[in-house]
C-alpha cells in the first residue's frame, strides 16, 4: 500500500544522535531511593519508557518508535550514562534475556488496569514476604512506565496537530487508541494492535533481541472479527494497519545497523485437529509480503488439515523472493513438545516460534537460549587419539584407528567421543548459567508478560514462570557426518580401497598427495539422494544426539532439546575443523542445518525430502531447518501445485520444516558483482531472511552454492 511505502521512506531517515537507551536508564538509576535490585531496575525501566520524547511518523497509524532512543549526548553525559548503567549488569541471550514470545493474549483480555489489579491481589497474598513484595512493586513500576509511554504518545499527537504533513484526524484517532490502551481494555482491532506493538517497542528499548509477536492471527482475531461484523473495520484497512506495524521492524536496521529477528506465527491447528487458519492469517501473510523487508520472520504452522488455499498463499509470498514464511510441520512439532516437555496439551497447541525456528511454549516459560555443537569435530578425536589435528582441542583417547576392525566398532568409539563432547558442552552450559546472585539480574517488565510471575511474585528466571526453561543444542553438520560415515563404510569396510590409517593421514594432510583417495570418498553415496546406505546414518544421528542431550537438564530442571539448525554457523564451525572423511577440505563450511551438503543432492527435490524425512523428528523439540532453492518459475500459476504436493509428502512422511529461496544462481552472482543494483534483494539465509548485499562474502557464497531445484 502507498502509506507503507511512504512510511518506509520516513523510517530510513535516521536523524541525529546515536542509540543511547542507557541515557534514559541512567536517569532512573541515579534517582532511585530503593536498595533492592528489582526496584532499582524498575525505576530505570520507568524512565526508559516514560521520559523520551515520542517519535511519530507522518504516515503512522500504529505508533511506537525506537527512534526516540537516538540521543545526541555530550561526552560527559555519555560517559556518566555508561558508567551508571555498568553497575547494573544485564542478562544476555546465553542467560535467558530474550528470544521470547510474550503472553499477549492475557494482556489484551484484561488490559493494563487488569494487570495492575492482579499485582495488587498478589501483594496481599505475599505481603509478609519482603523479596516477593519488592518484586511485585518493581513489576508495578515497570508496567507504569508502559502506561506512561502510551499516554505520552497520546499527548504528543495533540502537540503535533497543525504541524506540516500531519493529518489532524489521524492524530486524534491515534491518541484515542493510545489512551484506551493505557487506561482500559482494548476494544477494537486497532487498539489491540497498538497495545501489542507498544509493548514490543518497550522490549526493544530494553535491549532485548528476537522478541516474537507470537500467534498474532489468533489473539487479534476476536477484535478483527468483531470490528468487521460491526462495520467499523474493513479487511483492507486491517491489512494496512498490519503493514504499518510490520514495516517498523525495519527501524532496527536504521537505528542499530542490523536486522532484528521478530518471529510471527500464523496458522496451526487446535487440539481437536481442526485448522486454526482464519481470515486474519491471510491478511498477515499478505501484509508481510507487501512490506518486502527481511523482517518480520514469518512462520506458518502447516497441519494435515491446513487448507490448500493457505499453503498456496504461503507459496505465493515465498515466490516473491523474500524467503518466508518458513513452513512448519504442526503434527511433528506438537509430538516433539509432548514427548520432551512437561507441558499441558492446551499450551502445546498454542506453541509459537522465537528467533529463527525455535519452538516455544508461548508466554509460559523463561526466554530461550541455545548453543552450537560441532559434531564433525569428533572425527578428529576419533582418528587422532583424542587430539584435534591442530592440537588445539581434545576429546578422549579411544585408541589407534588401526585397531578398529568393523564399522560397528568404529561407531561405538565415535559415539563415545560424541557423548564426552555432550558432557563437556553441558558442563560449560551450567558454568555459564550458574548465577551466584540471580536476584541482581531480575527482569520486572518482561516478567509481567509471563504466566505465573505475577501470581507468585517471582522473576521469570527465578521460578516465576509456569514451566522451567528449555535449552537448545544446535547440532551442526548432519550432512557432513552422514556422508563421512558412508564414505568410511564403503571405502574401508565394504570395498577395502583404503584403510583407516591412510584416511587419517590424508585428512591430516588436507588430502594433499591423497587426491585419488579423496576422489573415492567423494564418489561414496551422499545424503539427500534417497539412498538408505547413507540415510541410515541420519536416522542414527538424530536419535543418538537427542538421547545423549536428554540425559541433562537446565539449572531449573527444564529439558535440553536438540536443534538441527545452523543460522550460518556451519560456516564459522567449518572454519575451525580439519578435513573430514567425506572428502571435505579443512576449514570448508559444514553442511547446513538439516540440509544435504550443497551440490551433493543430485537426484532432485523429491529425493531430498525422502532422505531428510527418514529420521524421527519427534525427537527434535527445538526444530530443524531444511533450506531449498527453487527457480522463480516454480511459483507461477499451474506450477505451485507441484511444489505444494512435494511439501505435503515431506510433512506426511515426518519432515519438520522447509524454507525456500525463490531465486536463481544468475541473480545472486550478479548481485555479488553489482550490489548497488540489488539493495532490496531479500533472501532466506538460514532461520531468517536478510538483504543479500549486506551479508558477508562467505554467507553470500553459501547461499549461492545451494542446490538449485526446479
Write out the residue ranges for each language-model feature.
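Conserved catalytic cores of very large enzyme subunits
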Residues: 1-139, 163-165, 169-710
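Amphipathic alpha-helices that form helix-helix packing interfaces
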Residues: 146, 150-153, 174, 488
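Extended non-globular scaffold/tether segments
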Residues: 137-149
Amino acid at each position: 500500500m502507498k502509506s507503507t511505502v511512504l512510511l518506509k521512506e520516513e523510517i530510513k531517515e535516521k536523524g541525529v544522535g546515536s542509540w543511547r537507551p542507557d541515557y534514559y536508564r541512567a536517569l532512573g538509576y541515579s534517582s532511585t531511593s530503593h536498595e533492592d535490585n528489582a526496584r532499582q531496575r524498575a525505576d530505570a525501566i520507568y524512565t526508559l519508557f516514560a521520559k523520551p520524547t515520542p517519535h511519530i511518523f507522518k504516515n503512522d497509524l500504529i505508533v511506537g518508535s525506537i527512534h526516540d532512543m537516538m540521543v545526541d549526548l555530550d561526552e560527559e553525559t555519555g560517559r556518566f550514562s555508561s558508567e551508571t548503567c555498568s553497575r547494573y549488569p544485564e542478562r544476555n541471550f546465553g542467560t535467558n534475556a530474550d528470544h521470547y514470545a510474550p503472553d499477549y493474549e492475557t494482556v489484551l483480555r484484561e488490559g493494563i488496569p487488569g494487570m495492575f489489579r492482579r499485582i495488587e491481589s498478589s501483594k496481599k497474598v505475599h505481603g509478609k514476604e519482603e523479596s516477593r513484595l519488592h518484586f511485585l512493586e518493581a513489576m508495578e513500576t515497570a508496567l507504569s512506565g508502559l502506561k506512561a509511554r502510551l499516554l505520552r504518545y497520546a499527548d504528543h499527537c495533540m502537540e503535533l496537530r497543525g504541524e506540516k504533513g500531519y493529518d489532524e484526524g489521524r492524530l486524534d484517532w491515534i491518541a484515542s487508541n493510545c489512551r484506551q490502551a493505557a487506561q482500559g481494555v482494548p476494544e477494537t482491532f486497532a487498539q489491540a494492535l497498538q497495545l501489542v506493538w507498544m509493548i514490543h517497542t518497550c522490549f526493544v528499548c530494553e535491549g532485548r533481541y528476537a522478541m516474537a509477536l507470537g500467534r498474532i492471527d489468533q489473539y487479534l482475531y476476536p477484535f478483527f472479527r468483531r470490528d468487521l461484523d460491526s462495520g467499523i473495520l474493513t479487511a483492507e484497512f486491517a491489512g494496512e494497519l498490519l503493514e504499518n506495524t510490520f514495516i517498523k521492524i525495519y527501524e532496527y536496521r536504521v537505528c542499530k545497523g542490523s536486522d532484528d529477528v521478530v518471529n510471527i506465527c500464523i496458522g496451526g491447528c487446535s487440539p481437536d485437529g481442526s485448522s486454526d487458519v482464519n481470515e486474519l492469517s491471510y491478511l498477515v501473510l499478505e501484509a508481510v509480503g507487501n512490506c518486502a523487508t527481511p523482517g518480520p520472520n514469518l512462520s506458518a504452522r502447516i497441519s494435515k488439515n491446513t487448507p490448500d488455499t493457505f499453503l498456496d498463499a504461503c507459496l505465493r509470498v515465498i515466490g516473491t523472493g523474500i524467503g518466508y514464511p518458513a513452513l512448519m510441520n504442526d503434527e511433528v512439532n506438537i509430538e516433539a513438545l509432548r514427548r520432551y516437555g512437561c507441558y499441558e496439551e492446551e499450551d502445546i497447541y498454542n506453541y509459537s516460534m522465537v528467533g529463527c525456528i525455535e519452538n516455544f511454549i508461548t508466554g509460559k516459560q523463561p526466554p530461550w537460549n541455545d548453543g552450537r555443537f560441532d559434531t564433525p569435530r569428533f572425527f578428529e578425536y576419533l582418528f587422532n587419539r583424542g587430539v584435534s589435528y591442530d592440537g588445539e582441542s581434545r576429546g578422549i583417547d579411544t585408541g589407534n584407528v588401526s585397531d578398529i576392525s568393523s564399522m560397528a566398532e568404529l561407531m561405538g568409539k565415535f559415539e563415545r567421543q560424541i557423548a564426552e563432547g555432550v558432557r563437556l558442552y553441558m558442563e560449560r552450559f551450567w558454568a555459564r548459567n550458574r548465577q551466584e546472585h540471580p536476584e541482581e539480574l531480575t527482569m520486572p517488565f518482561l516478567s509481567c508478560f509471563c504466566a505465573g510471575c505475577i501470581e507468585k511474585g517471582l522473576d521469570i528466571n527465578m521460578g516465576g514462570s509456569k514451566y522451567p526453561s528449555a535449552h537448545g543444542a544446535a547440532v551442526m553438520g548432519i550432512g557432513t557426518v552422514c556422508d563421512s560415515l558412508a564414505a568410511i563404510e564403503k571405502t574401508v569396510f565394504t570395498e577395502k580401497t583404503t584403510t583407516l590409517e591412510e584416511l587419517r593421514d590424508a585428512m591430516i594432510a588436507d588430502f594433499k598427495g591423497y587426491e585419488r583417495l579423496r576422489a573415492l570418498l567423494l564418489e561414496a553415496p551422499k545424503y539427500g539422494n534417497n539412498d538408505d546406505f547413507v540415510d541410515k546414518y541420519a536416522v542414527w544421528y538424530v536419535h543418538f544426539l537427542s538421547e545423549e542431550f536428554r540425559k541433562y537438564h537446565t539449572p531449573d530442571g527444564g529439558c535440553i532439546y536438540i536443534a538441527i539448525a545452523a543460522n550460518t554457523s556451519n560456516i564459522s564451525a567449518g572454519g575451525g575443523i580439519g578435513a573430514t572423511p567425506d572428502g571435505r577440505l579443512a576449514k570448508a563450511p559444514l553442511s547446513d542445518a538439516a540440509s544435504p551438503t550443497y551440490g551433493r543432492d543430485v537426484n532432485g527435490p523429491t529425493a531430498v525430502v525422502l532422505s531428510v524425512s527418514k529420521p524421527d523428528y519427534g525427537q527434535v523439540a527445538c526444530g530443524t531447518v531444511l533450506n531449498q532453492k527453487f527457480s522463480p518459475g516454480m511459483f507461477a500459476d499451474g506450477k505451485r501445485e507441484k511444489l505444494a504436493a512435494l511439501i505435503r509428502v515431506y510433512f506426511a512422511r515426518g519432515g519438520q520444516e522447509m524454507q525456500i529461496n525463490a531465486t536463481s544462481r544468475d541473480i545472486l552472482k550478479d548481485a555479488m558483482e553489482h550490489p548497488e543494483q540489488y539493495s532490496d534483494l531479500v533472501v532466506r539465509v538460514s532461520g531468517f531472511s536478510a538483504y543479500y548485499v549486506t551479508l558477508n562474502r562467505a554467507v553470500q557464497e553459501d547461499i549461492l552454492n545451494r542446490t538449485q531445484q526446479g
